[in-house]
Curated annotation (Swiss-Prot):
It comes from Bradyrhizobium sp. (strain ORS 278). This is 4-hydroxy-3-methylbut-2-en-1-yl diphosphate synthase (flavodoxin). GO terms for biological process: isopentenyl diphosphate biosynthetic process, methylerythritol 4-phosphate pathway; terpenoid biosynthetic process. Belongs to the IspG family. Converts 2C-methyl-D-erythritol 2,4-cyclodiphosphate (ME-2,4cPP) into 1-hydroxy-2-methyl-2-(E)-butenyl 4-diphosphate.
Length: 433
């Protein structure tokens, strides 16, 4: 019979679960939002409206901000869009929405920022793609113009290299050097190196033009998960600039969610990333705010931040009663997310609340007891009653067709007692039905 392993101090170290220490980067202020330097990982999103349409863009930015986006990027691709930016900012300010706007520039950013100073002033950050800021002799001049304008207005920049618009001159140079090497690398490795060099060389040039490091954020987006991970690992190892994470062209639906979550989850676990965006192709008529929800859920699931109360729900099986459990779990989750914009102002700390919605007696009561407030529905063949647990103790049993509404009312009462002004922790419940 084998002797049991001796537990040592070294072996106990593996008992500590959690991500690697955050990669140390330089803090950048984007409007009123801190990025990098140990600040909480920031969620950002991007509109898909025509920026020249002020009303629709304001409406979508407002929806994204309400969903929890802490920065919103808008396309600035032509004169009409640049002219609209200050009006968009003005309308958002009138609504009390202070979310920073990021201008996304390609090809003619130097021209638009020069000719529309109100646009340059209204934006909180400029995004520059070094692969299309200009070509051949014009590249350095046009890049310099944008950096000089950013310096003039005191704006940070994100220098974002992208797999689909890579600097072809740099790539050709690296490919030629690789071909002449005694130990050539494969083509994808050379492309990854071109991505990293493009971002780093551009950042160094920006600093030469007078831009301080605390106004530079880097990104290097790829559409393949493993390539993205490798690129960002290399970028982090070679610099301390603040880093924006995102998987480009992730796709729509579950494919896009899974691909982005897989790539970003690995990098975040390794301590890499200061701000993230989940780039999803929206379904026709779909909700643009889904990308914000996924980003928040990724960060919350991994323990980096808390945004909304956590709703634990079992997956359901043959023991659960038809669709009743599924409908209740969805109803409670939607209810909490819909109320959060109000709750986070009225009830500071409410995002740490844990709620359980369970489907039968196997794990239901136990899981509900571990939550702040939980409900365990009757499973198939069980008594038609749903016990509610508050802070680990049975509080009440709900019955009848109004279980969902009754449980929501109990959740609101609990939140008001625990997180309301002058609140104290809810009193222990001594009686149960």
């Amino acid at each position: 019979m084998n002797k049991p392993e001796t537990v040592t101090e070294n072996s106990l170290a593996s008992d500590v679960a959690g991500p690697a220490p955050r990669h140390q980067t330089t803090k950048v202020m984007v409007g009123n939002v801190a990025v990098g330097g140990g600040a909480p990982i920031v969620v950002q999103s991007m509109t898909n409206t025509d920026t020249a349409d002020v009303d629709s863009t304001v409406a979508q930015v407002a929806a994204l901000a309400r969903a929890g986006s802490e920065m919103v990027r808008i396309t600035v691709d032509r004169d009409e869009a640049a002219a609209a930016v200050p009006h968009i900012r003005e309308q958002l300010d009138k609504r009390g929405i202070t979310t920073p706007l990021i201008g996304d520039f390609h090809y003619i950013g130097h021209k638009l920022l020069t000719e529309y100073p109100a646009c340059a002033e209204a934006l909180a950050k400029y995004r520059i793609n070094p692969g299309n800021v200009g070509f051949k002799d014009k590249r350095d001049t046009q890049f310099s113009t944008i950096i000089e304008l950013a310096n003039k207005y005191g704006k940070p920049v994100r220098i974002g290299a992208n797999w689909g618009s890579l600097d072809q001159e740099l790539l050709s140079k690296l490919m030629d050097e690789n071909a002449a090497s005694a130990n050539p690398r494969n083509a994808r490795a050379v492309m990854r190196e071109a991505m990293v060099q493009s971002a780093l060389h551009s950042a160094e040039r920006a600093q030469e033009l007078g831009m301080p490091k605390d106004r530079i954020i880097l990104s290097a987006k790829v559409s393949a998960v493993q390539d993205l991970i490798a690129v960002y690992q290399d970028l982090a190892a070679r610099s301390d600039y603040a880093i924006h994470l995102g998987l480009t062209e992730a796709g729509m639906g579950s494919k896009g969610i899974v691909a982005s979550s897989a790539a970003l989850g690995i990098l975040l676990q390794q301590g890499i990333g200061d701000t993230i965006r989940i780039s999803l192709t929206p379904e026709p008529g779909g909700d643009r705010t889904l990308e914000v929800q996924v980003a928040q859920e990724l960060l919350q699931t991994m323990g980096f931040r808390t945004f909304v109360p956590l709703v634990a729900a079992c997956p359901g099986c043959g023991r659960t009663t038809s669709t009743t459990f599924q409908e209740l779990a969805r109803s409670i989750q939607d209810f909490i997310r819909d109320e959060m914009p109000t709750w986070k102002i009225k009830y500071p700390g409410v995002e740490a609340l844990n709620v359980a919605v369970m489907g039968c007696i196997v794990n239901g009561p136990g899981e509900s007891k571990h939550a702040n407030i939980g409900i365990s529905l009757p499973g198939t063949g069980e008594a038609p009653a749903a016990p509610v647990f508050v802070d680990g103790k049975k509080f009440r049993t709900l019955r009848g067709p109004t279980i969902a509404a009754d449980f929501k009312a109990l959740v609101i009462d609990y939140i008001d007692q625990r997180y309301g002004s002058g609140a104290k922790a809810p009193e222990s419940v001594t009686a149960a039905e």
